[in-house]
Regions:
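Detector for outer-membrane/organellar transmembrane beta-barrel domains
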Residues: 161-181, 192-273
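Residues on the lipid-exposed face of transmembrane beta-strands in outer-membrane beta-barrel proteins
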Residues: 27, 31-33, 68-78, 111-117, ...
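Outer-membrane beta-barrel "beta-signal"
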Residues: 327-346
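Outer-membrane beta-barrel initiation region
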Residues: 15-88
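Repeated loop/turn-to-beta-strand initiation elements of outer-membrane beta-barrel proteins
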Residues: 79-87, 118-125, 166-174, 206-213, ...
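Transmembrane beta-strands of outer-membrane beta-barrel pores
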Residues: 31-37, 76-78, 93-99, 127-135, ...
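Outer-membrane beta-barrel translocator domains and adjoining extracellular loop/strand segments
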Residues: 39-46, 99-108, 126-128, 134-144, ...
Length: 346
């Protein structure tokens, strides 16, 4: 972080602070209206169990939910002496509310500062926060094997990213991030520090669109393993590998100005090999997300987008009952509206 700040200050040295502050701020207000058909990511077996024991659903009566999300973002561009060099500061905050699930109400946001020195040349630092994200009700084995308790976690992530061109309209992007994922008091045995690295190659085709291929590798260290209560005697560390393939077509189709799809496949392998923990021992899963989207500018400053996501997780385990318990299907669909504004006090 200190190194990044030194770089930014060095390029601002030749400008007065009044010149530095003269650029306008672009604000965007967003509203999302969506539907989730399996909020708690329940397997078929768990849905059958929930019909007899609704405490699994955390007090609600449905598997699905309508949700709304409000967002506010701001972008400030600072042009430096060299026309190809600039600094961008971007911040965004989201407030989400699942109507049928009172526990799934949370806020998230992030701040990015980036230095650009030409086409596809960028150095960026990001700080992200996800606050009190509700997963579902689980058993707290340190207290009771019969009662369920609300389980939520909070993410704090820092990421350093750099991109550079390879040749005309072809560029590479790499990043490294550090995420602290800490759970509420009843489930601290799952607290983890996660290191993730990514490498993405992107190609933009003239009068067509953009396609990318990204590889992601992460290691989650269960920092509370062996510390504290009995439940921490089991190691919940894991490794995961992802492949991500997004494609966008910007020449218009089906009434949209741009359409696209993305395919993301995640492979996760738990570290634990302990017969006393059949739920995690030797367990791995393959999760696939397939998105289809389209967007259209209704007015110069008003944009609407539509997205549908199909999600599937297949779990592999030494135990058939674990495979069935931890596999699920899910469908998301949402419509977003964004209204852009320009604030220029000068």
């Amino acid at each position: 972080m200190r190194f990044f700040a030194i770089i930014l200050l060095s390029f601002l040295w030749g400008q007065t602070w009044t010149d530095y502050l003269r650029s306008p701020v672009k604000w965007t207000v967003g509203f999302t209206n969506g539907y989730d058909n399996n909020v708690l990511r329940l397997s078929a077996i768990e849905k059958d169990d929930a019909a007899l024991n609704q405490t699994i659903l955390g007090g609600t009566k449905t598997f699905d939910s309508h949700y709304v999300r409000f967002s506010l973002s701001g972008l400030k561009k600072i042009q430096l002496g060299d026309r190809e060099k600039k600094i961008q500061i971007f911040a965004k905050s989201n407030l989400s509310n699942y109507i049928q699930y009172k526990h799934r109400q949370y806020w998230s946001g992030y701040v990015k500062a980036s230095y650009h020195w030409g086409a596809y040349r960028r150095l960026e630092y990001m700080l992200r926060h996800l606050d009190n994200y509700y997963m579902r009700h689980y058993k707290d084995l340190d207290i009771s094997v019969n009662h369920l308790f609300s389980c939520s976690f909070t993410d704090r992530e820092q990421r350093l990213l750099i991109s550079h061109p390879i040749k005309l309209r072809l560029w590479v992007t790499g990043s490294i991030s550090y995420t602290q994922r800490y759970y509420d008091r009843s489930f601290t045995e799952f607290d983890s520090d996660i290191i993730t690295t990514t490498l993405k190659v992107s190609k933009k085709f003239s009068d067509f669109g953009t396609i990318s291929l990204e590889g992601i590798y992460g290691i989650a260290d269960n920092i509370t393993f062996g510390k504290g209560a009995k439940s921490s005697d089991l190691d919940r560390s894991y490794r995961h590998t992802e492949l991500y393939l997004p494609f966008s077509y910007d020449q218009g189709m089906l009434g949209f100005e741009a359409v696209g799809f993305s395919l993301r496949t995640d492979f996760r392998q738990y570290e634990v090999e302990d017969i006393s923990d059949p739920l995690h021992s030797g367990r791995s899963h393959r999760e696939t997300k397939f998105d289809i989207w389209g967007k259209k500018n209704v007015k110069k400053n008003l944009m609407i987008s539509c997205t549908i996501r199909f999600r599937n997780r297949f779990t592999d385990s030494h135990y058939d009952w674990v495979s069935e318990l931890k596999s699920f299907n899910q469908i998301h669909a949402w419509i977003s509206i964004e209204w852009k504004m320009l604030y220029d006090r000068y």
